Every structure is written in C-alpha cells, then in structure tokens.
Amino acid sequence: MVQKRIDPKELNLKERVVNINRVAKVVKGGKRLKFSAIVVVGDENGHVGAGHGKAAEIPDAIRKAIEDAKKHLIEVPIVGTTIPHEAIGDFGASKVLIKPAPEGTGVIAGGAVRAVCELAGIKDIRTKSLGSNNPANVVHATIEALKQLKKPEEVARLRGKTLEEIIK
C-alpha cells in the first residue's frame, strides 16, 4: 500500500518534544557529546508524524527532528472523537494497543503515546503500552498502530458489503 504524501505547508502543525537524550561517541581523545531529540508534529485534525534528530546543540536537534517529522506525516481516520477500531502497533521491543473509547473518556495514555494521540486530534481513546518503554520505540509503535486504522467505508468496500452491514 503506497501512502500518499501529505504537504506540511498546507497544515497548521503543532509540535511536541517527546524526549531529549545526550549521546556520546567515544573517540581517541575522549567523548564527543551530541543531543538526540524525538518530536511529534500534528494538526489535531487527523494528521500526525514523528521524527528524530541529532546535533551538537539541543535546539538544532529539535529543529532536525521537526523537519524529519514533517516528512513522515500520516493521515489518521477519526470517527467522531475516537478511532474506528482496535489496533496493535509493533516497533522494536515496544508494542502499543489502542482502543476506541466512548465520548467523554478522554485520552487514557502514557507520555509518548499521549503526545501522538493528542496531536493526531483523537479526543477519546484507551491505550496500553506493552514491552519496552523506550520513548522512540513507543512513538513509532503508536504511529504503526494508527497506520493500521481503516475508515468504515474502506472496510465495507474491501469486503464488498454496504456501509450499513459493517456498522450494524
């Protein structure tokens, strides 16, 4: 399945820094320090992306991560205030389970998953992070779970049924 490219210039994107980490490369003369940043961007209206950036200074790492996140935007199908169905996303040793929730529930999610869900524009959702809690892997596992979501119309078309038969 080929993802259609989303133009970030057309969207009013907000960004949120999920994690900043100091990383070191050991060389002959000692350690070379750099900073690694993970950023999530979204328009709170069904578009979200995550990016990773590394640089000698924190602001540069964040800027690079934002640019990377804008290159990896995905569209999330939202039904009312929640998602259409359950999904499980896997990335590395992290697994994230996302479930639709009734209106008024709110975003029940941990730090990294919460950032992705809120910037995607999902108002009501239940999530569970399983396995590794490494923020980078959790963010990517959440994005993988959101990529699996299909609109009810798409499911009906794929099964060769009417929308009423699917929703009942």
UniProtKB/Swiss-Prot annotation:
Q: Does the keyword Cell membrane apply?
A: no
**What Pfam families does the record tag this protein with?**
Ribosomal_S5, Ribosomal_S5_C
Keyword set includes rRNA-binding: yes
Keywords assigned:
Ribonucleoprotein, Ribosomal protein, RNA-binding, rRNA-binding
Please list every transmembrane segment annotated in the UniProt record, as residue ranges: none
Which GO BP terms apply? Answer: translation
Q: Where is the S5 DRBM domain?
A: 13-76
Q: Can you quote a single GO CC term?
A: small ribosomal subunit
**What GO molecular-function term can you cite, just one?**
structural constituent of ribosome
Q: How does it assemble?
A: Part of the 30S ribosomal subunit. Contacts proteins S4 and S8.
Q: Which HAMAP family match?
A: Ribosomal_uS5_B
Its family remark reads: Belongs to the universal ribosomal protein uS5 family.
Q: What is known of its domains?
A: The N-terminal domain interacts with the head of the 30S subunit; the C-terminal domain interacts with the body and contacts protein S4. The interaction surface between S4 and S5 is involved in control of translational fidelity.
Q: What does this protein do?
A: With S4 and S12 plays an important role in translational accuracy. Located at the back of the 30S subunit body where it stabilizes the conformation of the head with respect to the body.
Full protein name: Small ribosomal subunit protein uS5
Organism of derivation: Caldicellulosiruptor saccharolyticus (strain ATCC 43494 / DSM 8903 / Tp8T 6331)
Q: What is the lineage of its organism?
A: Bacteria, Bacillati, Bacillota, Bacillota incertae sedis, Caldicellulosiruptorales
